[in-house]
Amino acid sequence: MSFWDILGTLLIKPLQLLFEVVFVMANRVVGDPGLAIIALSLAMNFLVLPLYRRADAMQEEERETELRLHKGVAHIKKTFRGDERMMMLQTYYRQNNYKPTYVLKGATSLFLEIPFFIAAYAFLSNLELLHGVSFGPIRDLGAPDGLLTVAGVTVNVLPFLMTAINLVSCVIFTKGSLPKTKVQLYTMALFFLVFLYTSPAGLVFYWTLNNLFSLIKTIFYKLRHAHIILGVLFSLAGITAAVYGLFFYGQPTPRRLVFFIAAALVLQLPLLAVLCKGKVRLPEKLCGAQPSKKLFVSGSVFLAVLTGLLIPSAVIHASPQEFVNMTSFLHPAWYIVSALCFAVGTFVIWFGIFYSLAKPSVKALLDQCVWALCGIALVDYMFFGRSLGNLSAGLVFDNGLQFTTGQMLVNLAVVLAVFAAFTFAASKWRQRIPGILTVGIIAVVCMSVVNTVGICRSINEIKAGAQSDGGTPSFSLSKTGKNVIVLMLDRAMGPYIPYIFNEKPELEAQFDGFTYYSNTASLGIKTNISTPSLFGGYEYTPAELNARDQELLVDKQNEALKVLPVMFDQNGFDVTVLEPVYAGYGWVPDLSIFQDYPDIRRFNVRGYFSDPKLQKQAIRSNKRNFFCYALMKAAPLCIQANLYDYGTYNQGNFVSDDGYAGQSTDGALTASGISAGFMNSYNVLANLPNITQISKDDTNTYMVLTNDTTHDPVLLQEPEYVPAPEVDNTQYEREHADRFTVNGRTMTVEQRNDYAYYQCNVAALLQLGKWFDYLRENGVYDNTRIIVMSDHGGTMGQFPELLADDGMDAESFASLLMVKDFNSKGFTTSDEFMLSADVPLLAVKDVVAEPVNPFSGRRIDEVSKPKQEQLLLYSFEWDVNVNCGTQFIAGDWYTVNGDIWNKNAWHSVANKAVLTAER
């Protein structure tokens, strides 16, 4: 971030974020960008009304003073010259308690208007959501209005309307003012006409509404009993809005009903304030409290470091590797810098501006509010919403963000209790609060520094270990030799295959020669637990690894990843390793684990094929969203879902022509946006033909690839199953709802994640099918053994047959296994019981003369395969930064006897235990 980026984030982007959140929330409710602009204008004007009232009062005070002193100043300037004039003016000003710098008070409104205008301009002039959208006579809110054509010349009418309203307001406001004041305001009105003439109609419409609001405000300032009239008008507007929204505006939905009722109630507040004036008194201690600038500043700084430093740094520190893309590298610390700038700009600068312009009584109230906010934010962050599942690099929860009514009620009760306690503390020990907050600031900063140092250390290690062979990733396949390919699709669901092939029968021809093993189980339900045995065989099952309790899990993971590549390398194969999962226990695989084997080519490919422009868009999104995430975590549970907004954090430009940031879903069948995380993996599968080099020599080859296309659930456009900026599968699902029953077995597909996981699995297989066609066309399909498997299934609850009586979901173990051998034909299904640890045996069978583990010396073949039932670990401890000792953290252990689809075949062995294999 440059100096100007930081300055803009401090001053402008907090306002732009406010514009964006208000607009997106309004548009989500009313469903019309034009109406959303009206709602935005009303909301922003009411929000800053106290600010502008104070600024206008200061301006009026300065104007009256200027008029009062005008004759005296004019006389001095006419009578005296040089230093004598200066001395006389200084004396005259001092006698009238006036300083020349007070002239800045008259420009307060202008100083406030400039950043708000810049923020509105930056947001609305680039808002993709307005493009092509009509509103009334305006054909396109994303382009100049062009409402009038004269002699073939298109004239934009809105800027002239805006200027006319502005000039009328200026005439009323400057009545009796000095000529120079009038000239300043008229010049500004003409400037906006010229500057905004070619701007998008949506922006000009917004600014026209602002000028209209300003005109109404100016008129009411001149009326007697203006506050009563204004209160009545607001009340009538609220009633009208409620009637229109409830009975005449489109199809009513719960969200719209709540919105219009809430808006109607809010618009009753001005009238209520008028009616209650003088009748309702605040507690004497609250009314009589003196403002404490130290309290306000220390509270604002605490909120800034909590949301801008601690929360973002804690998220990144939990797994720094996830926030690194080596193909478009940005140090994650810059996300913290960006969040801190947002937070300082919001809580210190703009809160401070509001505070400085407030009356003393309001300042005292703001002191207590900021103090209470500190307590509420800290409690919400530390004690609520702690078990929300995996958080992706795009700050999206895998399982969404949902809270029960009970959880929200408990949280609300705690929030009210904290508010009451902090208010009581402020009334008793007000002078001590700044000191308490200072201690809190120091503690938060220290924790954040520790997090940041840990992040920097991890990133340095990642950069050192993630160096590939250089150049474009590629691998060779021989036309005359034998090729072995092992493809791991993370979290691919084995039970989905019959449904996918039923819907897409063309896959059967593309997967010619494959055998689908429908009765396959993994040794664990998380990648860190299951992949050692998948890549290393039965010596690396969870129980076997626990038995080696003098070695770190990361070292055993690295060893398992090297078993097959090193074995094939030692047997003369040309070996390529792509994205070795959890190598070095890093999200970005540490390729240095192969440094002792120079002939093994290795590459990290996730994100390599994504457009750099799109990656930069994702980076920009994260710079914004880290602060939004922090605000969400510090907010009460009842509003977190609205702030989270399905992982978009109310981002207006969520869908754009030149980038993606993530996906926002509205139900199970429709979505907007494209997920960067998904595309980083999907593009690898789509580019497999481009990185496959066909060799005519007889050198045998081995390639292993790990891919996350099936791991990052997003909604795709059916029936093509491709990512799209706008997804709407409503009609397709209505017409094909029966496809989830095959051979008498029904798979439950109801929720968003059910559809998303299924669609990602389909998308992955479709891309593999295209690649297999490419291999056929180039004559390297028949002489290639291909193993497609996954490390585990998912806890989805989609098959009643896999739900155990104790709550265990065996679908978590139901991994994918499909094998094509050399010269095999036809697509077949086998119900033979298989474990993921069988993959190494299948890979080396009949192609390695002496299949011996290069690290243990034990054979890897059917003869040496264990005969006893294997222990399967049902543990959700996926985080390798936590589950990183010498043994896996205690979990539940099961065995399965021959048939994963038979509930009676599953047996619980131990709960919350650490089991080891018998030796």
What are these regions (language model features)?
Residues 287-291, 295-298, 306-345, 349-361, ...:
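Catalytic domains that recognize anionic headgroups
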Residues 46-53, 122, 159-176, 345-361, ...:
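Transmembrane alpha-helical segments in integral membrane proteins
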Residues 234-243, 301-315:
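Canonical alpha-helical transmembrane segments of integral membrane proteins
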Residues 1-287:
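Helix-loop-helix
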Residues 32, 146-163, 336-346, 405-418:
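Hydrophobic alpha-helical transmembrane segments
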Residues 34, 112, 413, 437-441:
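Sec-dependent signal peptide hydrophobic core
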